[in-house]
């Protein structure tokens, strides 16, 4: 009798929550960066949400500083939002709140991107996801090339690191960059041109910088 092997179905990859970080004050820009027009159409907000949807489908949320901030960035009612539990504690607070939400709702981790990176691509995010699936208990971060620099707000954080991120929030420096440089993580190289962030009108060029 010939034994036949039955192929077992592949296990579904653990679910990721896509988190758009849009809680900054945009003080140097003078207007919410989420509302800036994107070169490919729409706004920085709509472009960033569409980019995340192509990776995480509808499993996305927007991290904001407060309920009042939701109206300021004109977030559509259909898009869920998370709010910082304490004000003015920087992006580490948004990361911590998102990880707590992900853990409570059955997600394995969060894919974070800021709203002010207009040139980041879907392929860049997929490269992070691919690296994370190889080692889903590790933090995966974008590593800017030329010059090299870690980008702690572009990456995947597993819910297992929730407590360590909360300790960053409670620390004196509250710096993800400082903490992650000395912690265990893996990196994915992404060209610096695609990690260009926009902080002032001059970063946008004409006609926004009045030159």
Curated annotation (Swiss-Prot):
It is found in: Cytoplasm. It holds the Pfam family NTP_transf_3. The keyword Metal-binding applies. Keywords: Cytoplasm, GTP-binding, Magnesium, Metal-binding, Molybdenum cofactor biosynthesis, Nucleotide-binding, Transferase. GO terms for cellular component: cytoplasm. GO terms for molecular function: GTP binding; metal ion binding; molybdenum cofactor guanylyltransferase activity; nucleotidyltransferase activity. GTP binds at residues 21-23, 33, 84, 116. Mg(2+) binds at residue 116. Its cofactor is Mg(2+). Its EC number is 2.7.7.77. It catalyses: Mo-molybdopterin + GTP + H(+) = Mo-molybdopterin guanine dinucleotide + diphosphate. InterPro entries: MobA-like_NTP_Trfase, Molybde_CF_guanTrfase, Nucleotide-diphossugar_trans. GO terms for biological process: Mo-molybdopterin cofactor biosynthetic process. It comes from the Bacteria. Transfers a GMP moiety from GTP to Mo-molybdopterin (Mo-MPT) cofactor (Moco or molybdenum cofactor) to form Mo-molybdopterin guanine dinucleotide (Mo-MGD) cofactor. The N-terminal domain determines nucleotide recognition and specific binding, while the C-terminal domain determines the specific binding to the target protein. Belongs to the MobA family. This is Probable molybdenum cofactor guanylyltransferase. It comes from Rhodopirellula baltica (strain DSM 10527 / NCIMB 13988 / SH1). The gene is mobA.
């Amino acid at each position: 009798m010939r034994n036949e092997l039955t192929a077992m179905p592949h296990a579904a990859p653990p679910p990721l929550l896509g988190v758009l970080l849009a809680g900054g004050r945009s003080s140097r820009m003078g207007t919410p960066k989420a509302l800036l027009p994107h070169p490919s159409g729409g706004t920085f907000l709509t472009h960033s949400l569409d980019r995340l949807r192509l990776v995480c489908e509808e499993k996305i949320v927007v991290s904001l500083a407060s309920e009042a901030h939701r109206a300021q960035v004109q977030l559509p009612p259909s898009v869920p939002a998370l709010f910082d539990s304490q004000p003015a504690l920087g992006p580490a607070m948004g990361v911590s709140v998102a990880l707590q939400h992900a853990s409570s709702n059955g997600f394995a981790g969060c894919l974070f991107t800021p709203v002010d990176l207009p040139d980041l691509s879907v392929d860049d995010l997929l490269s992070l996801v691919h690296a994370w699936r190889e080692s889903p208990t590790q933090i995966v971060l974008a590593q800017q090339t030329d010059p090299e620099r870690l980008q702690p707000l572009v990456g995947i954080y597993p819910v297992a690191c929730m407590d360590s991120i909360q300790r960053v929030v409670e620390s004196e420096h509250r710096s993800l960059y400082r903490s992650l440089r000395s912690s265990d993580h893996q990196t994915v190289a992404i060209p610096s041109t695609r990690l260009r962030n926009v902080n002032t009108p001059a970063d946008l060029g004409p006609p926004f910088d009045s030159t």
